[in-house]
Amino acid sequence: MSDLVAKTAIDRRLADIVTPVIEGMGFELVRLRLMSGKTRTLQIMADRPDGGIVVDECADISTAVSAVLDVEDPIEDNYTLEVSSPGIDRPLTRLKDFDAWAGYEARIETAELIDGRRRFKGELAGTEGDEVLITIEDGKEGFVTIGLKFDWLSDAKLILTDELIAEMLRQKKASGNFDESQFDEIQETEGEEADEAETPITRH
C-alpha cells in the first residue's frame, strides 16, 4: 500500500536511506520532501511513536541523518536539511494516522474527483480496511460518514482546533519533555555553514 510519507521517486529513495536511522533512534518518519529552489531543501518531519518530540531530539536526528546522507550522497546539488516536528495541525501520511487522530477535524484532498469534488472537510472516524472514514456535512442529511480509499488521497492534514491544541500539549507533558518555548521549532542544518558538531551536507 502506498503512503503520503514520500511522494516522488527521489523522495522515496531518500526515505529508504533515512528511515532506518530515524527508527533506530526510536522515532518515526512522518513526511519527507525534497523541495526545489535556489538552494534545495530536504524537509524531514519526525515524531515519537506516541507523539511529543522536542527540538533537541530533532537536532539529534539532524546530526544522525546528515552523517548517513554524507556517505550515501543521493542529492547532487547543494541543499539544506530541515528536521522538524509535525506541528499541531500535522499532516496525515499513513493509514494508521487516521485511526490515531479519530475524533479530530481534518482536511482531505484526493488526486481525482470523487462525486464531483476533491476536497473534504470533517471529523475523522478512523479506518475500515484500506478506507479512511470521515464525517462530513451533507446539505440533505445533516452529517454523513463516507469512506475514501487511502490510495486516492493526495493530501491530508489536521485542522487547528482548541481540542487538538489541548491534546498536543497533553502529549508534550506526558513525554516529560514539555517546553512551551520550544514548541514546534525547526532544527536546521545549513550545508556549508554547518557547525562542526553536525556533519556537513553540502553537495556539489
UniProtKB/Swiss-Prot annotation:
UniProt-listed GO biological process terms: ribosomal small subunit assembly; translation
GO cellular component, one term: cytosol
Name the record gives this protein: Ribosome maturation factor RimP
UniProt source species: Cereibacter sphaeroides (strain ATCC 17025 / ATH 2.4.3) (Rhodobacter sphaeroides)
Location in or out of the cell: Cytoplasm
Region (Disordered): 177-204
Bias (Acidic residues): 181-198
Major location category of this protein: cytoplasm
Pfam families, alphabetized: DUF150_C (PF17384), RimP_N (PF02576)
Keyword flag Cytoplasm: yes
Similarity section: Belongs to the RimP family.
Job description of the protein: Required for maturation of 30S ribosomal subunits.
Keywords: Cytoplasm, Ribosome biogenesis
Gene of this entry: rimP
